[in-house]
UniProtKB/Swiss-Prot annotation:
Species this chain originates from: Lawsonia intracellularis (strain PHE/MN1-00)
Cited Pfam families: Enolase_C (PF00113), Enolase_N (PF03952)
Binding site for (2R)-2-phosphoglycerate: 163, 337, 366-367, 388
Lineage top rank: taxon: Bacteria
Gene encoding the protein: eno
Catalytic activity: (2R)-2-phosphoglycerate = phosphoenolpyruvate + H2O
Classification of source organism: Bacteria, Pseudomonadati, Thermodesulfobacteriota, Desulfovibrionia, Desulfovibrionales
Cofactor dependence: Mg(2+)
GO annotations of cellular component type: cell surface; extracellular region; phosphopyruvate hydratase complex
Entry's family note: Belongs to the enolase family.
Protein name: Enolase
Length: 433
Protein backbone atom coordinates (compact mmCIF):
# COMPACT_ATOMS: atom_id res chain seq x y z
CA UNK A 1 0.00 0.00 0.00
CA UNK A 2 3.01 2.34 0.27
CA UNK A 3 4.60 1.57 -3.09
CA UNK A 4 5.20 4.53 -5.39
CA UNK A 5 2.51 4.47 -8.07
CA UNK A 6 3.29 7.65 -10.00
CA UNK A 7 5.56 10.69 -10.07
CA UNK A 8 4.78 14.01 -11.67
CA UNK A 9 6.89 17.16 -11.93
CA UNK A 10 5.99 20.68 -12.99
CA UNK A 11 7.76 23.99 -13.44
CA UNK A 12 6.76 26.61 -10.84
CA UNK A 13 8.29 29.94 -9.75
CA UNK A 14 10.39 30.63 -6.68
CA UNK A 15 10.53 33.76 -4.51
CA UNK A 16 12.75 35.56 -7.02
CA UNK A 17 10.43 34.85 -9.93
CA UNK A 18 12.76 32.21 -11.34
CA UNK A 19 11.59 28.75 -12.37
CA UNK A 20 12.08 25.79 -10.08
CA UNK A 21 10.71 22.27 -10.02
CA UNK A 22 7.86 20.89 -7.93
CA UNK A 23 7.34 17.13 -7.66
CA UNK A 24 4.33 15.07 -6.61
CA UNK A 25 4.76 11.45 -5.57
CA UNK A 26 1.56 9.38 -5.39
CA UNK A 27 1.44 6.03 -3.61
CA UNK A 28 -0.72 3.09 -4.61
CA UNK A 29 -2.86 3.82 -1.55
CA UNK A 30 -3.63 7.27 -2.95
CA UNK A 31 -1.51 9.30 -0.54
CA UNK A 32 0.38 12.17 -2.16
CA UNK A 33 3.58 13.97 -1.18
CA UNK A 34 4.60 17.25 -2.77
CA UNK A 35 7.92 19.11 -2.60
CA UNK A 36 9.33 22.24 -4.24
CA UNK A 37 13.08 22.71 -4.68
CA UNK A 38 14.90 25.89 -3.54
CA UNK A 39 17.80 27.66 -5.28
CA UNK A 40 20.80 29.59 -3.95
CA UNK A 41 22.39 32.90 -5.00
CA UNK A 42 25.81 32.49 -3.39
CA UNK A 43 26.67 28.85 -4.01
CA UNK A 44 29.63 26.68 -3.12
CA UNK A 45 31.59 25.32 -6.08
CA UNK A 46 31.30 21.78 -4.69
CA UNK A 47 27.51 21.80 -4.45
CA UNK A 48 25.47 19.22 -6.31
CA UNK A 49 24.58 20.70 -9.68
CA UNK A 50 21.29 22.46 -10.27
CA UNK A 51 20.31 22.03 -13.92
CA UNK A 52 18.77 24.81 -16.02
CA UNK A 53 17.57 24.70 -19.63
CA UNK A 54 19.89 27.43 -20.92
CA UNK A 55 17.31 28.62 -23.46
CA UNK A 56 17.80 32.41 -23.44
CA UNK A 57 14.44 32.86 -25.18
CA UNK A 58 12.65 31.45 -22.15
CA UNK A 59 13.03 32.73 -18.58
CA UNK A 60 16.45 34.12 -19.58
CA UNK A 61 17.82 30.60 -19.75
CA UNK A 62 16.67 29.63 -16.25
CA UNK A 63 13.82 27.32 -17.21
CA UNK A 64 13.73 23.79 -15.78
CA UNK A 65 11.74 21.92 -18.43
CA UNK A 66 14.61 19.46 -18.93
CA UNK A 67 14.48 18.70 -15.22
CA UNK A 68 10.73 18.18 -15.43
CA UNK A 69 11.27 15.80 -18.36
CA UNK A 70 13.88 13.87 -16.40
CA UNK A 71 11.52 13.41 -13.46
CA UNK A 72 8.52 12.47 -15.58
CA UNK A 73 10.64 10.14 -17.75
CA UNK A 74 13.68 8.12 -16.61
CA UNK A 75 13.40 8.95 -12.89
CA UNK A 76 9.75 7.97 -12.78
CA UNK A 77 10.45 4.70 -14.57
CA UNK A 78 13.25 3.83 -12.14
CA UNK A 79 11.41 4.63 -8.93
CA UNK A 80 7.82 3.51 -9.53
CA UNK A 81 7.11 0.33 -7.57
CA UNK A 82 9.62 1.02 -4.78
CA UNK A 83 8.17 1.19 -1.27
CA UNK A 84 8.15 4.87 -0.23
CA UNK A 85 8.97 3.79 3.33
CA UNK A 86 12.35 2.66 2.02
CA UNK A 87 13.80 6.17 1.69
CA UNK A 88 17.38 4.92 1.42
CA UNK A 89 16.46 2.59 -1.45
CA UNK A 90 14.63 5.39 -3.27
CA UNK A 91 17.53 7.79 -2.85
CA UNK A 92 20.18 5.25 -3.80
CA UNK A 93 18.19 4.41 -6.92
CA UNK A 94 18.23 8.11 -7.85
CA UNK A 95 21.95 8.42 -7.13
CA UNK A 96 22.78 5.33 -9.20
CA UNK A 97 20.56 6.45 -12.06
CA UNK A 98 22.41 9.76 -12.21
CA UNK A 99 25.82 8.13 -11.88
CA UNK A 100 27.85 11.32 -11.33
CA UNK A 101 29.53 12.71 -8.22
CA UNK A 102 27.65 16.01 -8.37
CA UNK A 103 24.32 14.84 -9.84
CA UNK A 104 25.05 16.69 -13.07
CA UNK A 105 23.33 14.20 -15.36
CA UNK A 106 19.79 14.44 -14.00
CA UNK A 107 20.27 17.52 -11.83
CA UNK A 108 20.19 17.83 -8.05
CA UNK A 109 16.95 19.77 -8.41
CA UNK A 110 15.30 16.78 -10.12
CA UNK A 111 16.60 14.24 -7.63
CA UNK A 112 15.87 16.32 -4.53
CA UNK A 113 12.28 17.00 -5.55
CA UNK A 114 11.59 13.27 -5.80
CA UNK A 115 13.46 12.48 -2.59
CA UNK A 116 11.59 15.01 -0.45
CA UNK A 117 8.20 14.33 -2.02
CA UNK A 118 8.69 10.62 -1.30
CA UNK A 119 9.30 11.32 2.38
CA UNK A 120 6.19 13.47 2.56
CA UNK A 121 4.05 10.80 0.88
CA UNK A 122 5.40 8.14 3.24
CA UNK A 123 4.66 10.29 6.29
CA UNK A 124 1.10 10.80 5.06
CA UNK A 125 0.68 7.07 4.47
CA UNK A 126 1.67 6.09 7.99
CA UNK A 127 -0.27 8.95 9.57
CA UNK A 128 2.68 10.77 11.11
CA UNK A 129 3.62 14.44 10.94
CA UNK A 130 6.71 14.84 8.76
CA UNK A 131 9.03 15.83 11.62
CA UNK A 132 8.06 12.70 13.54
CA UNK A 133 8.44 10.50 10.47
CA UNK A 134 12.00 11.83 10.10
CA UNK A 135 13.01 11.75 13.76
CA UNK A 136 10.62 9.51 15.65
CA UNK A 137 9.14 10.27 19.07
CA UNK A 138 12.36 11.99 20.15
CA UNK A 139 11.79 14.83 17.65
CA UNK A 140 10.75 17.64 19.97
CA UNK A 141 13.40 20.38 19.95
CA UNK A 142 12.24 23.69 18.48
CA UNK A 143 15.18 25.52 16.90
CA UNK A 144 16.57 28.95 17.66
CA UNK A 145 15.91 31.05 14.55
CA UNK A 146 18.79 32.97 12.99
CA UNK A 147 16.78 35.87 11.57
CA UNK A 148 18.40 37.74 8.72
CA UNK A 149 17.29 41.33 9.30
CA UNK A 150 20.01 43.23 7.42
CA UNK A 151 21.03 41.91 3.99
CA UNK A 152 24.21 42.63 2.05
CA UNK A 153 26.54 40.90 -0.37
CA UNK A 154 24.92 38.82 -3.11
CA UNK A 155 21.52 39.19 -1.43
CA UNK A 156 21.13 42.97 -1.71
CA UNK A 157 22.13 45.89 -3.97
CA UNK A 158 24.03 47.84 -1.31
CA UNK A 159 27.60 48.46 -0.14
CA UNK A 160 27.81 45.80 2.58
CA UNK A 161 30.13 42.85 1.94
CA UNK A 162 28.78 40.73 4.78
CA UNK A 163 25.80 38.93 3.29
CA UNK A 164 23.63 38.47 6.37
CA UNK A 165 23.33 40.18 9.75
CA UNK A 166 21.13 38.03 11.97
CA UNK A 167 19.49 38.13 15.38
CA UNK A 168 19.08 35.06 17.59
CA UNK A 169 16.36 35.37 20.27
CA UNK A 170 17.92 32.87 22.68
CA UNK A 171 16.26 34.34 25.77
CA UNK A 172 12.75 33.22 24.87
CA UNK A 173 11.14 30.31 26.68
CA UNK A 174 9.21 29.05 23.65
CA UNK A 175 9.56 29.26 19.89
CA UNK A 176 6.38 31.32 19.78
CA UNK A 177 7.98 33.91 22.07
CA UNK A 178 11.20 33.82 20.04
CA UNK A 179 9.28 34.59 16.87
CA UNK A 180 7.49 37.47 18.58
CA UNK A 181 10.78 38.89 19.85
CA UNK A 182 12.25 38.70 16.37
CA UNK A 183 9.24 40.42 14.82
CA UNK A 184 9.33 43.21 17.40
CA UNK A 185 13.03 43.81 16.80
CA UNK A 186 12.51 43.69 13.03
CA UNK A 187 9.80 46.37 13.15
CA UNK A 188 11.82 48.48 15.59
CA UNK A 189 14.80 48.29 13.25
CA UNK A 190 12.61 49.45 10.37
CA UNK A 191 11.47 52.47 12.38
CA UNK A 192 15.05 53.38 13.33
CA UNK A 193 16.40 53.00 9.79
CA UNK A 194 13.54 55.02 8.36
CA UNK A 195 14.02 57.80 10.93
CA UNK A 196 17.67 58.04 9.88
CA UNK A 197 16.69 58.43 6.24
CA UNK A 198 17.50 54.92 5.05
CA UNK A 199 15.40 53.10 2.49
CA UNK A 200 13.64 50.15 4.09
CA UNK A 201 13.22 48.01 0.99
CA UNK A 202 14.14 44.38 1.59
CA UNK A 203 16.56 41.91 0.02
CA UNK A 204 16.03 38.36 -1.23
CA UNK A 205 15.54 36.96 2.26
CA UNK A 206 13.29 39.68 3.64
CA UNK A 207 15.86 41.73 5.54
CA UNK A 208 16.51 45.41 5.05
CA UNK A 209 19.19 46.45 2.58
CA UNK A 210 20.35 49.96 3.59
CA UNK A 211 23.45 51.73 2.30
CA UNK A 212 25.52 52.18 5.45
CA UNK A 213 28.85 53.84 6.20
CA UNK A 214 30.42 50.62 7.48
CA UNK A 215 29.76 47.13 8.74
CA UNK A 216 30.12 48.47 12.28
CA UNK A 217 27.14 50.71 11.63
CA UNK A 218 25.07 47.64 10.74
CA UNK A 219 25.98 46.01 14.06
CA UNK A 220 25.22 49.24 15.92
CA UNK A 221 21.78 49.42 14.35
CA UNK A 222 21.08 45.85 15.42
CA UNK A 223 22.11 46.49 19.02
CA UNK A 224 20.03 49.68 19.11
CA UNK A 225 16.97 47.90 17.68
CA UNK A 226 17.28 45.10 20.23
CA UNK A 227 17.49 47.59 23.10
CA UNK A 228 14.66 49.82 21.87
CA UNK A 229 12.46 46.75 21.43
CA UNK A 230 12.99 46.12 25.14
CA UNK A 231 15.54 43.30 25.07
CA UNK A 232 19.08 42.80 26.29
CA UNK A 233 21.77 42.29 23.61
CA UNK A 234 24.00 39.39 24.54
CA UNK A 235 21.78 37.67 27.10
CA UNK A 236 18.33 37.69 25.50
CA UNK A 237 19.33 38.27 21.89
CA UNK A 238 22.64 37.30 20.30
CA UNK A 239 23.99 38.24 16.87
CA UNK A 240 25.16 36.10 13.96
CA UNK A 241 26.58 36.85 10.52
CA UNK A 242 27.06 35.09 7.21
CA UNK A 243 30.14 36.65 5.67
CA UNK A 244 29.93 34.57 2.46
CA UNK A 245 33.62 35.35 2.05
CA UNK A 246 34.03 33.28 -1.12
CA UNK A 247 32.04 35.98 -2.92
CA UNK A 248 34.86 38.53 -2.55
CA UNK A 249 37.90 36.20 -2.48
CA UNK A 250 40.27 36.35 -5.43
CA UNK A 251 43.95 35.44 -5.84
CA UNK A 252 44.15 34.50 -2.15
CA UNK A 253 42.99 37.96 -1.07
CA UNK A 254 39.76 39.36 0.33
CA UNK A 255 38.43 42.46 -1.42
CA UNK A 256 36.30 44.46 1.02
CA UNK A 257 34.65 47.72 0.00
CA UNK A 258 35.76 49.51 3.17
CA UNK A 259 39.46 48.83 2.50
CA UNK A 260 41.47 50.27 -0.38
CA UNK A 261 43.78 47.25 -0.47
CA UNK A 262 42.71 43.59 -0.19
CA UNK A 263 43.25 41.62 3.02
CA UNK A 264 45.12 38.37 3.47
CA UNK A 265 43.70 35.57 5.64
CA UNK A 266 45.35 36.78 8.84
CA UNK A 267 44.04 40.31 8.33
CA UNK A 268 40.58 38.97 7.56
CA UNK A 269 40.61 36.99 10.81
CA UNK A 270 41.59 40.11 12.76
CA UNK A 271 38.76 42.01 11.06
CA UNK A 272 36.28 39.36 12.23
CA UNK A 273 37.78 39.20 15.72
CA UNK A 274 37.17 42.92 16.05
CA UNK A 275 33.44 42.41 15.64
CA UNK A 276 33.38 39.64 18.26
CA UNK A 277 35.10 41.95 20.74
CA UNK A 278 32.73 44.87 20.14
CA UNK A 279 29.36 43.17 19.76
CA UNK A 280 27.44 40.15 21.14
CA UNK A 281 28.38 38.11 18.06
CA UNK A 282 28.09 34.38 18.71
CA UNK A 283 28.10 32.84 15.22
CA UNK A 284 30.12 33.48 12.05
CA UNK A 285 29.25 31.57 8.89
CA UNK A 286 31.72 31.32 5.99
CA UNK A 287 34.08 33.80 7.63
CA UNK A 288 36.71 32.77 5.10
CA UNK A 289 36.50 31.43 1.56
CA UNK A 290 35.72 27.81 0.72
CA UNK A 291 39.21 27.26 -0.74
CA UNK A 292 41.11 29.00 2.07
CA UNK A 293 41.59 25.91 4.24
CA UNK A 294 44.76 27.21 5.89
CA UNK A 295 42.92 30.37 6.84
CA UNK A 296 39.97 28.37 8.16
CA UNK A 297 42.29 26.35 10.39
CA UNK A 298 43.74 29.55 11.84
CA UNK A 299 40.28 31.08 12.26
CA UNK A 300 39.19 27.98 14.19
CA UNK A 301 42.26 28.19 16.44
CA UNK A 302 41.59 31.88 17.11
CA UNK A 303 37.83 31.81 17.66
CA UNK A 304 36.63 28.19 17.71
CA UNK A 305 36.57 27.91 21.51
CA UNK A 306 34.54 31.08 21.92
CA UNK A 307 31.95 31.22 19.16
CA UNK A 308 30.19 29.11 16.56
CA UNK A 309 32.12 28.91 13.26
CA UNK A 310 29.74 27.65 10.60
CA UNK A 311 30.85 25.99 7.38
CA UNK A 312 28.49 26.39 4.44
CA UNK A 313 30.37 26.77 1.15
CA UNK A 314 33.33 24.82 2.53
CA UNK A 315 31.23 21.76 3.54
CA UNK A 316 28.20 22.01 1.17
CA UNK A 317 26.22 19.49 3.28
CA UNK A 318 28.57 16.80 2.01
CA UNK A 319 29.75 14.06 4.41
CA UNK A 320 33.06 13.70 2.56
CA UNK A 321 33.83 17.42 2.82
CA UNK A 322 32.69 17.53 6.45
CA UNK A 323 34.81 14.51 7.33
CA UNK A 324 37.85 16.22 5.82
CA UNK A 325 37.01 19.40 7.73
CA UNK A 326 36.69 17.58 11.03
CA UNK A 327 40.03 15.87 10.43
CA UNK A 328 41.76 19.17 9.66
CA UNK A 329 40.17 21.20 12.47
CA UNK A 330 37.94 23.37 10.30
CA UNK A 331 35.09 25.14 12.10
CA UNK A 332 32.76 23.64 14.70
CA UNK A 333 29.37 23.86 13.00
CA UNK A 334 27.77 23.00 9.66
CA UNK A 335 24.96 24.60 7.70
CA UNK A 336 22.53 22.04 6.33
CA UNK A 337 21.00 22.78 2.92
CA UNK A 338 19.19 19.85 1.36
CA UNK A 339 19.76 21.02 -2.22
CA UNK A 340 23.53 21.18 -1.76
CA UNK A 341 23.73 17.39 -1.62
CA UNK A 342 20.49 16.41 -3.35
CA UNK A 343 18.78 13.66 -1.33
CA UNK A 344 17.25 13.36 2.12
CA UNK A 345 19.34 10.27 2.89
CA UNK A 346 22.66 12.01 2.19
CA UNK A 347 21.48 15.02 4.19
CA UNK A 348 20.72 12.82 7.20
CA UNK A 349 24.09 11.06 6.81
CA UNK A 350 25.85 14.43 6.96
CA UNK A 351 23.85 15.47 10.02
CA UNK A 352 24.72 12.22 11.79
CA UNK A 353 28.42 12.73 11.06
CA UNK A 354 28.21 16.29 12.39
CA UNK A 355 26.62 15.14 15.64
CA UNK A 356 29.19 12.36 16.07
CA UNK A 357 31.92 14.98 15.56
CA UNK A 358 30.36 17.39 18.10
CA UNK A 359 29.61 19.97 15.40
CA UNK A 360 26.42 21.97 15.79
CA UNK A 361 23.91 21.86 12.93
CA UNK A 362 21.86 24.69 11.43
CA UNK A 363 19.13 23.75 8.96
CA UNK A 364 18.93 26.42 6.27
CA UNK A 365 16.80 27.79 3.47
CA UNK A 366 18.18 29.23 0.22
CA UNK A 367 17.76 32.77 -1.06
CA UNK A 368 15.44 31.48 -3.79
CA UNK A 369 12.64 29.82 -1.81
CA UNK A 370 9.03 28.70 -2.18
CA UNK A 371 6.12 28.20 0.21
CA UNK A 372 7.42 24.66 0.90
CA UNK A 373 8.13 24.27 4.63
CA UNK A 374 10.01 20.93 4.56
CA UNK A 375 13.06 22.38 6.34
CA UNK A 376 10.95 23.35 9.36
CA UNK A 377 9.99 19.71 9.87
CA UNK A 378 13.57 18.63 9.15
CA UNK A 379 14.95 20.97 11.83
CA UNK A 380 12.64 19.50 14.47
CA UNK A 381 13.01 15.97 13.13
CA UNK A 382 16.76 15.96 13.69
CA UNK A 383 16.66 18.16 16.83
CA UNK A 384 19.00 20.56 15.06
CA UNK A 385 18.55 23.31 17.61
CA UNK A 386 18.99 26.08 15.03
CA UNK A 387 17.28 27.14 11.80
CA UNK A 388 18.16 29.85 9.32
CA UNK A 389 15.20 30.82 7.20
CA UNK A 390 15.28 34.54 6.64
CA UNK A 391 13.68 37.63 8.05
CA UNK A 392 10.25 38.51 9.38
CA UNK A 393 8.84 39.49 6.00
CA UNK A 394 8.11 37.64 2.75
CA UNK A 395 5.70 34.75 2.98
CA UNK A 396 8.28 32.32 1.55
CA UNK A 397 10.28 32.85 4.77
CA UNK A 398 7.32 33.01 7.14
CA UNK A 399 5.96 29.71 5.79
CA UNK A 400 8.77 27.97 7.69
CA UNK A 401 8.25 29.97 10.89
CA UNK A 402 4.51 29.36 10.81
CA UNK A 403 5.06 25.62 10.37
CA UNK A 404 7.31 25.64 13.43
CA UNK A 405 4.51 27.35 15.37
CA UNK A 406 2.17 24.54 14.36
CA UNK A 407 4.69 21.89 15.36
CA UNK A 408 5.27 23.49 18.77
CA UNK A 409 1.52 23.64 19.34
CA UNK A 410 1.17 19.98 18.36
CA UNK A 411 3.97 18.86 20.68
CA UNK A 412 2.40 20.75 23.59
CA UNK A 413 4.33 20.30 26.86
CA UNK A 414 6.92 17.99 25.31
CA UNK A 415 8.23 20.80 23.07
CA UNK A 416 11.66 22.10 24.06
CA UNK A 417 12.85 25.48 22.76
CA UNK A 418 16.62 25.31 22.24
CA UNK A 419 17.32 28.96 23.12
CA UNK A 420 18.15 28.50 26.82
CA UNK A 421 20.37 25.50 26.01
CA UNK A 422 22.25 27.46 23.35
CA UNK A 423 22.53 30.48 25.62
CA UNK A 424 23.90 28.43 28.51
CA UNK A 425 26.54 26.74 26.34
CA UNK A 426 27.69 30.11 24.97
CA UNK A 427 27.14 32.38 27.97
CA UNK A 428 30.75 33.56 28.22
CA UNK A 429 31.04 34.94 24.71
CA UNK A 430 28.67 37.83 24.63
CA UNK A 431 29.08 40.06 27.66
CA UNK A 432 29.27 43.41 25.87
CA UNK A 433 26.49 45.22 27.69
Amino acid sequence: MTAIASIWAREILDSRGNPTVEVEVTLDSGYIGRAAVPSGASTGTREALELRDGDKQRYNGKGVLKVVEAVNGPISEAVIGIDALRQVQVDNTLIDLDGTDNKSKLGANAILGVSLATARAAAEAVGLPLYQYIGGTNAKVLPVPLMNVINGGAHAPNNLDIQEFMIMPVGAETFRDALRMGAEIFHTLKTILSADGHVTSVGDEGGFAPHLKSHDEAFQYLVKAIEEAGYNPGSEVMLAIDVAASEFYKDKRYFLTEYKTPLNSEEMIEWLKGFTSRYPLISIEDGLAENDWDGWRELTVELGNDIQLVGDDIFVTNPIMLSQGVEEGIGNSILIKVNQIGTLTETLDTIELAKQSAYTTIVSHRSGETEDSFIADLAVGINAGQIKTGSLSRSDRLAKYNQLLRIEEELEDSAIYYGPVFSESNHSCCDHT
